[in-house]
Amino acid sequence: MKAIFGNSFYDFEYLILKQVEVVGVLPEKFEEIISFAKKVAKNKKNLELEFSYPFNQDKELESFFSKSLDMNDVALITNPIVEVSKILRKLTKCKKVNIKLTSLRSPMCPIFHVDNIPCRFLVTLYGSGTEWIPHDEVDWKIFDIKDANKNPLKDRSKIKNFRTGEWSLLKGGSWQENFNGVVHRSPHNNEERLLLSIDPYS
C-alpha cells in the first residue's frame, strides 16, 4: 500500500487504486484557509458543527457556516468542501456527505484505530495534524490490544503526521476486501485543534 501527496484535489481520485491507502493534498489557498481557521479557533472555543450536504445546496452550506461561525469569508472553507464532496460522490456513489467541524482541546480518538466506513476526509485546520501509520508498517498483534500506551509499529517504523491544512482522504475498513483501513489517531497533546471531517452518506 502507498500514500500519494499532491497539490490538486483531482489527486484524490487515485484512491480508487487498490494499492493506494491515503491521498493528501495541500491546496493552493491553504495559508489563507489556516489564517481563517485561526480566527475561528480564537472566536469559537466550543465549536461542534454538523451539516448534512446533499450536493445541490451550496448556498445553504455557505449560509449555515456563515451563521454558525458569525463570519463573512466562509467561502474559503465551503468552496473546497463542495469540491471534495463531489469527488466523494464520484468515488463512492453516495447521495450526500456528512460534514463536521469541531474544536478540540484533548485527543478525540487517543487510540490507534481504523474507521469502519468506505473512506473519510480529515483536515486539521488548526493545531497538530492527525497521526497515522502506513499499512505495511503496522504491527497488527499490538494493534488488536487497543492500548493507548503501546504504538502498533513494526521495528524501525515511525508514526507519521498529516500536515496542518492538508486535506487527507483515508480509506476505511469497508472500502475493499483484504484491507483493514488506514490506522490513525488524534495527536497526543492537549494543543487546541480545529478538525474538519467529511464522510460519504448513502
Residue ranges and their predicted role:
Residues 11-12, 108-112, 183:
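Catalytic micro-motifs at enzyme active sites that drive phosphoryl/nucleotidyl and oxygen chemistry
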Residues 33-34, 132-134, 171, 178-179:
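Short helix/loop capping segments that flank catalytic or ligand/cofactor-binding pockets
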Residues 67-106, 110-114:
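Extracellular-facing segments of soluble proteins and assemblies that are Gly/Ser/Thr-biased and enriched
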Residues 152-202:
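Catalytic core of Fe(II)/2-oxoglutarate
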